[in-house]
């Protein structure tokens, strides 16, 4: 068997905070609770994030909030409030332009391993398999090349606004929401986050704030202790999502060892151990997945989509299949193991038939013609 259950939960980790008398939130009140290792009262995280997004929080307050919440350990309710406020300030895609079954393939980053851009390659493969993909991403924060950097090196336009991303999704089957373009109000937190230089609760927000709001996805989390928190946020949204953490530390499904999956469906979370060997994947070495700068990673994309075999292709197929499984989970009729078998078949076929390579060419051409 490739999968074994380890437990389940119904969403938010850490329980509900104690009720407290209604009062106007303030930074001393919120920071005091966090430094006292207490969960925030309902609405306090939302207030803090709104202060940050509107430019009313000072850098010291932003930094103190991010670090204190991280040290306390955030709950799904708190992170859900942060993400909800961030989405309320985002530029949305036009109404009725995102298919109900669209998926995202994205990770938190921050695993410190600097692999090739597996989620970016997987997203292209998933779209070529016929699943609409609206990917949210950014430039590199700690690695040599983020998803946006690699797409740009491939010739994909990463700077498109909501209307053109919607057109790309409709005409090509995939669209890319460049985080700074869609979340301009986040610039206040982004600068502080760079200066802090260590992972905080803000690292969780990218995968939770896709402005297209897809209902399904494969979401990588580099932080094993926070993956369940992310899963709880998706459960509250009743999304069909696989939150994944490679047991080697990757924010992807890994082929070097087992991965842990938090399967989100129908508002609940199940924790599973996933072994790709159960589906015939050979064990890889981590250095076989190593990436480089944007040009090197773009070359790796072209090689895999062009049919090159080996550990990188295996990891891409595995992650693309995971996204297809999450997509299948939108149907109450989906069965877990058959969905994996079908996902792996479709992902492999998308590469082997040339469909993924052709989709990338169409995506590049779309950007040149607009």
Swiss-Prot record:
Binding site for Mg(2+) 1: 119, 252
Residue positions, PTM N-acetylalanine: 2
Ligand binding (Mg(2+) 2): 251-252
GO CC, alphabetical: cytosol; extracellular region; plasma membrane
Residues involved in 5-phospho-alpha-D-ribose 1-diphosphate binding: 107, 110-111, 115, 117-120, 135-143, 147
Co-factor: note: Binds 2 magnesium ions per monomer.
Keywords of the record: Acetylation, Amino-acid biosynthesis, Aromatic amino acid biosynthesis, Glycosyltransferase, Magnesium, Metal-binding, Transferase, Tryptophan biosynthesis
Enzyme Commission number: 2.4.2.18
Chain ranges passing through the membrane: none
Disulfide-linked positions: none
Keyword Transferase among UniProt keywords: yes
Subunit structure: Homodimer.
HAMAP family according to UniProt: TrpD
Family under the similarity heading: Belongs to the anthranilate phosphoribosyltransferase family.
Name assigned to this protein: Anthranilate phosphoribosyltransferase
Organism annotation: Mycobacterium tuberculosis (strain ATCC 25618 / H37Rv)
Gene: trpD
